[in-house]
């Protein structure tokens, strides 16, 4: 089940969201940014929805605040005010996935949350594959270094064998009166 965190200063919006999506998603709601951070710390949240206009900090400011510690959840900004500056800020600072206007349409929002969760899991899979690839590359470097050392040892061994043969050849020549 998709874990969704919804931050909004208006409790009735949170109640409506929980009622609409409690069967579809694992819904976490709060009016407080500090509580939202606690939820992020304790739960694997895939999608975060935040209202833009809140008294303590804006949705964009909240996303900026959590980005360093929680970069993976997919972020969506929800607002009843079409503010182009907020949209630009959200895109540039908060790295939002979607900007959603209030009032939201239940089926559209459900689809957006599902798409966002899919993106979350694709990114995680890619990160895992990237880490595995980096491990394989590291192992390949170690193996290549080992081969270079063995080749260098073999080359120096061949040089010493050649020196021994030359020395013995000289001794044989001396013995034969050469």
Question: PLM features: residue spans?
Answer:
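Conserved acidic segment of CheY-like receiver
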Residues: 1-12, 16-21, 48-49
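Acidic, metal-coordinating helix/loop segments flanking the phosphotransfer/catalytic sites
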Residues: 29-47
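Acidic catalytic/metal-coordinating carboxylates
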Residues: 31-32, 58-61
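Short amphipathic alpha-helix used as the core "switch/output" element in two-component signaling
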Residues: 38, 60-72, 89
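Receiver (REC) domain active-site loop signature in two-component systems and cognate sites
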Residues: 54
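Hydrophobic/aromatic residues positioned on beta-strands within the core alpha/beta folds
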Residues: 78-79
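C-terminal output helix
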Residues: 83, 104-113, 117
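C-terminal output/effector regions of signal-responsive regulators
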Residues: 128-178
């Amino acid at each position: 089940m998709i874990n969704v965190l919804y931050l909004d200063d208006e409790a009735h919006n949170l109640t409506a969201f929980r009622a609409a999506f409690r069967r579809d998603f694992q819904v976490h709601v709060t009016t407080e940014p500090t509580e939202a951070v606690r939820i992020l710390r304790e739960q694997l949240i895939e999608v975060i929805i935040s209202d833009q206009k809140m008294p303590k900090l804006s949705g964009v400011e909240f996303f900026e605040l959590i980005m360093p510690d929680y970069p993976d959840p997919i972020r969506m900004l929800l607002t009843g005010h079409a503010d182009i500056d907020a949209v630009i800020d959200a895109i540039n600072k908060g790295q939002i996935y979607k900007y959603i206007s209030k009032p939201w349409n239940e089926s559209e929002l459900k689809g957006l949350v599902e798409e966002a969760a899919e993106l979350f899991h694709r990114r995680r899979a890619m990160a895992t594959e990237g880490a595995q690839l980096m491990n394989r590359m590291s192992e390949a470097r170690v193996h290549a270094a080992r081969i270079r050392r063995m080749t260098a040892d073999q080359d120096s061994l061949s040089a010493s064998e050649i020196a021994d043969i030359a020395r013995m050849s000289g001794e044989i020549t001396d013995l034969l009166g050469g």
